[in-house]
């Protein structure tokens, strides 16, 4: 899962002792095999409710997604269980986003996953962090065709478009996609990419003047600059 491991390193330190989150994660994972829906939901809901969401996001939700993905990869849980956990994590992030005020001013940011990419937890996390900082966010989610992305950017004229790449593409597919982004999206918006795949394809992105974000700390720095620029134009 893209950016998830890096997110923990770049996130603010949580106020709870790390062992508390580690113990909770072990308890949550223990409910997945054998699968116990009631205990899983009670523990997850209870934990997220009692800490600030930023701490819950980086101390519980992102590590949980990362570890569940690894369990599925190692054939310790079924893909249906992995999807179940992922949907709960998505719901938590969407719920937190919906409690934030709708920005009428500030930098405009489009967040999406490229064509064929269905894993959107990291992209959703990016959208949340943009919302927290007062950006006007257009979150498009998974598997967005380049033509559709370009069409939207042409209409809303964003200050920045961020794409989430969890995995590197083959050389041919990467070249085709990056050229399409440069030709169709870049004329309407500055482009940035993040994730393990983006970092692996760094040279190709740099060749086409597309910014590669190393982690969430670098994202936050870029967003702060955008918001200052937006304020100065107001």
Put a short name on every predicted segment:
Residues 1-101:
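Long amphipathic alpha-helical segments
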Residues 75-234:
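C-terminal regulatory/effector modules of DNA-binding transcriptional regulators
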């Amino acid at each position: 899962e893209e950016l998830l491991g890096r997110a923990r390193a770049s996130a603010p330190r949580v106020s709870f002792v790390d062992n508390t989150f580690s113990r909770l994660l072990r308890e949550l994972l223990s409910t997945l095999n054998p699968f116990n829906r009631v205990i899983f939901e009670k523990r997850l809901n209870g934990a997220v409710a009692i800490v600030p969401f930023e701490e819950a996001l980086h101390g519980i939700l992102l590590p949980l997604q990362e570890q569940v993905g690894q369990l599925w990869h190692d054939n310790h849980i079924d893909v249906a269980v992995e999807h179940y956990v992922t949907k709960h994590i998505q719901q938590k992030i969407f719920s937190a986003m919906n409690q934030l005020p709708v920005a009428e001013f500030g930098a405009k940011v489009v967040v999406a996953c490229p064509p064929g990419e269905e894993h959107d937890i990291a992209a959703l996390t990016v959208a949340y962090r943009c919302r927290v900082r007062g950006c006007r966010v257009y979150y498009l989610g998974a598997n967005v065709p380049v033509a559709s992305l370009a069409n939207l950017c042409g209409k809303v004229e964003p200050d920045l478009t961020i794409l989430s790449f969890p995995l590197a593409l083959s050389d041919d597919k990467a070249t085709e996609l990056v050229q399409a982004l440069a030709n169709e999206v870049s004329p309407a918006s500055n482009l940035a990419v993040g994730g393990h795949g983006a970092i692996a394809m760094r040279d190709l992105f740099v060749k086409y003047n597309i910014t590669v974000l190393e982690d969430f700390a670098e994202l936050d720095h870029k967003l702060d600059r955008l918001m200052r620029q937006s304020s100065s134009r107001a």
